[in-house]
């Protein structure tokens, strides 16, 4: 795995490295955990955007029940910083999609989101109960979801943290969500590839990926820093690649 972009502590939003460590800690001990191969030009990426260096580092793993764990850390010059993480489940397992994103700039963190998103209409009952029993803190600046945000669960947390205290609360929320997901990964049984429930989850994950690809901001940044063809490959093959058909 590649190391994340390095910066002095004075220029990196503290929430990004701390949340990255929280995420890495959550995948330790998952069943059959192993690195996931990726194209060599996707693991460590350098480009230029309007005179600033764009650095992207990707860490990819998989385990029993999760077809891909992806942690992306990106930095544009000394301004924009991004953390992006998705855990895509194997459709044979009744598991949601974990997603977390942080966007930060010189003024601090402007957006932070975490969710366990359903892939078959509703969350698995055990996860729904666990999330309902540990509600998100009452953050002061809750943000509106984008138009394609129907893919998220009712428990999605999308905020602009108001100061260091709320950044700590958000990290704690991500840790709670990951603990719930870890428990489910360890306990959920594999269903047959031909089961109707597996097919529904496969189709739901296809829909999730399609909706995420509608985020034109990501595509525009990548196209400017590299080119349209490369941006398409990065989005289609790495960020939101479709699951293989079950069976």
Curated annotation (Swiss-Prot):
The keyword Hydrolase does not apply. The gene is pcyA. One of its GO terms (molecular function) is cobalt ion binding. Its EC number is 1.3.7.5. Keywords: Oxidoreductase. It comes from the Bacteria. It comes from Parasynechococcus marenigrum (strain WH8102). Pfam families: Fe_bilin_red. InterPro entries: Ferredoxin-dep_bilin_Rdtase (IPR009249), Ferredoxin_bilin_OxRdtase (IPR022870). GO terms for biological process: phytochromobilin biosynthetic process. It is an enzyme of class 1 (oxidoreductase). HAMAP family: Ferredoxin_bilin_red. Belongs to the HY2 family. This is Phycocyanobilin:ferredoxin oxidoreductase.
